């Protein structure tokens, strides 16, 4: 029996890097009032620190695949971790909003290179039969970090000082760099001339789109400006797609879209990610503003969603191998929609135990679906297309993350309008309608799953092993 599995260790390393990146996008949200007081600015102004990070990540992700092939995957991965860690130190040392924002932009640059390159290292040469287990490992940060971030940030800001939110990245970064030197090969790929036009169109287009939806979610008095930024971003993205299809050496291509299983992760996968991404935003607000729970009580209940994420993990591979992708995606998609209905039915008489059970069940279906979508995305993608598929997937996941929060904010505003209430003072009825709306969004994603055949994605499954396990 092998005591050390290098493939497993590499997957855990990349999962840790992904956890750091996503955690830093969410961990400061509950600490914003404390940081704002130190900078002597209104707390609302600190939202630029959140937006700057997310926009910077989106801006530089298209560059990640090219940089990894040009300079070596290990070189870029280690450099990205170093930049991310150094920027974390600068964030902690910041004494003004301007310094803090610049540090967050630099941190976003590191995060943009760190996560996609890390995933590429794991996925490019991975045998298909190991894809299911590996993706399950590197998916858990996307499940846990958005839930743990606000709770951890609030705890650190309350019991220590907000600077430690960033300083805790220092030992993690050092460990990740040392592990990378031992575990990773500095593989390079064939690259042509750098596609600067493609980078500007894709990077700026995606970044403006993300900035627009961030503004849309956080401001109610600048609707036209936000929509204008989104429109410019979408225009640049359309021009980028046209450019990529015609360019001889594009920064990345859309060839992976030829595979039905990858298209599922792009279309239906994006829809369900947006719906699932709304839960960490809507649930705490509903518990506090709708039901009168304290921030600590709401955060504690939200951890049951995280518990559900973890509880199903040991069974996800067996479920996929036993029932196949199509059946599980369709059934689980319906369960996700029903989960939002259950959240919508919560009222003042609902016990904390029942709320915890509903959140736990939602965590189970959330974990199952994201693992399915992230696995089937690469099931039929050959190694020579993995870089482009990985880059496109990373961009979409970043955009889905922002869209989930924006759509949640818009759902609250629309529900308040329907009920004749103020969007600035939502009550339980507002959240009931919002949850029902997000359930409908989740249900729409099932359409793409129904278009799959029973055999789609079978190349990465081990059905014979699952059948043997059932018979024993």
Residue ranges of predicted features:
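Helix-loop-helix hairpins in multi-pass membrane proteins, especially solute transporters
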Residues: 61-197
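Small-residue-rich packing faces within the transmembrane alpha-helices of Major Facilitator Superfamily
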Residues: 58, 85-86, 109, 170-177, ...
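Intrinsic disorder in cytosolic terminal tails and internal cytosolic loops
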Residues: 1-6, 450-472
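Structural signature of transmembrane alpha-helices in multi-pass secondary transporters
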Residues: 21, 50-53, 57, 84, ...
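Hydrophobic transmembrane-helix bundles of small-molecule transporters
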Residues: 158-268, 434, 438-439
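Helix-breaking motifs and short loop linkers at transmembrane-helix boundaries and internal kinks
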Residues: 38-40, 72, 93-99, 160-161, ...
